[in-house]
Amino acid sequence: MTKLTIHSPAGLHQVDVADGQTVREALDTTDWRVRAACGGIGSCGACVVQVKSGDVNPLTLPEYQRLDEAARAKGWRLSCQLRLNGDTQIHTTHLAKPSPWRSIPKADLMQHTLQCKDISQYVYGIAVDLGTTHLRVTLWNRRTGQRIASRKGVNPQDSYGADVLTRLDVALQHPEKARKLSEFARVAIIKALRDMLAREVGEIKSMLSEIGQVMIVGNTAMLTLLTNHGYADLLNPDFWQTQIHCQPVDYDEWHAQWLLPHAKITVLPPVAGFVGSDLTADLVATKLCNSSNAAMLIDVGTNTEIALWTGKKLLITSVPGGSALESVGIQNGMPPESGAIVHIKQSENGLIVETIDNDLALGFCGSGLLDAIAVLVATKVLKPSGRFAQSTGGAGFALIADNPHTMIIGRDIDAFQRAKAAIASAMETLLEFAQMSWDEIERLCVCGAFGRHLNIENAQALGLLPPISPEKIELNADASLAGCELALLCKDNVALFEKMTANAQTYNLSLIPSYEDRYINHLLLKPIKSGEFS
């Protein structure tokens, strides 16, 4: 990683740039996007920046074509052609208008080799992963198997509640708000698509008519709210072990709103109850069931979905994993964006606090909250019960003394304990049904945005992850999006998903007494015990 310092009318900013990444690609993942309209090939000339100092790559052919000699002499470059060989400072006045959309870093996206070579028209398609907190969308040329662009942003439905149950209740009690929730999600999807087309292709209207497929996955609650259909069944426990029907009632309305006249819109069906098609996408992307070895998958989020593959059969469940793991409802919680604390380490000289973009700490994202609690337990500031060893007078504990944004209070710790207890208890209960122990698990996939920056050692120390070798644990943050992309590129996409979970056994843990007993035990901030379950 090299450091890029940006001087602009909006202020001074620093960004980490990965090896091989262009300056534009790095800026597209932040709040400081430059203007662009050609997808990074250097033909539009809109993304100009001025290099003030640093070691950078030589001028490219597109730069000789788009920039005159005087501009080149003053250090002006096209950011889509500019790569860093060392720490660099640039100046720009060509920032794009503020946008809620960011590119997904390429390192976070899985690579695929599938192609739909027999497609002769309407070759473009989009994959949509609709989560409770975030929305992720990618644009593809299905015939060539090329991912053209990606976008992520906040799910605007959060204005009606941070968690799924609140939104479902709002929809059930207020039909007009249910329509609003559906509208919010649909508008967000098309806005993400239009942002990609404007910046990466330079053309919107004609490209919309060339899109032939829209593939959507998500947790069941989000799918019912998107389609405005099926959410009443989801709130009925009698349906928690059956598939919830949540397909759009009027596809013509969607086509008209999105201006996608030729697109086949597919909402991939959920498995059952609160287990959505995002879990199936995880299974497809990670190939969890492609081996005879026992494996487990956890998609951590506000609604956490868990799958256990015994080598022969698939067991599935879901639990309210707690919005605390996404820092929702935490006093100083925030999404994983600039200024969010992502890692905390204890050193001889005190705490090392790492934030996204190395900005001033503004709060905790999920992984930062976990690290903070782990450090407080390790230094005996916190007891395993979750209580502070010494009274804080209700004020909590600030990791950085003069920064109130690093304060953790008792309510934050309690929310984390409830979330991790629900997940740990669910994992053990599935093992009980399979008559297995942790020693038999050869692979554990942690999916969802929470896993992107997760410190595995700390997660095990607090009892969120099981006592297996860290080498067996994989972090697959964008697996559900990757699975959706594979479905987009596969002719038999719906059949692929249905086959994956056709013989799965789904469990409603609210009906299992042993789950409740385990939940109480797992509230303590200590490692999960190894062994068999009965």
Can you describe what each PLM-predicted range is?
Residues 4, 76, 95, 99, ...:
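Acidic, glycine/GT-rich loop-and beta-edge segments that sit at the periphery of enzyme/chaperone cores
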Residues 19-45, 52-79:
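Immediate flanking context of iron-sulfur cluster ligation sites
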Residues 57-127:
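Fe-S ferredoxin-like electron-transfer domains
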Residues 106-123, 265-295:
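Conserved phosphate-binding catalytic cores of ATP/NTP-utilizing and phosphoryl-transfer enzymes
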Residues 137, 145-163, 232-246, 281, ...:
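Glycine-rich phosphate-binding loop of actin/hexokinase-like ATP-binding domains
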Residues 157-199, 329, 340-345, 418, ...:
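N-terminal phosphate-binding loop and adjacent alpha-helix
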Residues 188-199, 279-282, 417-439:
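Phosphate/ATP-binding catalytic cores across multiple sugar-kinase/actin-like superfamilies
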Residues 310, 436-501:
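Catalytic phosphate/nucleotide-handling subdomain of diverse soluble enzymes
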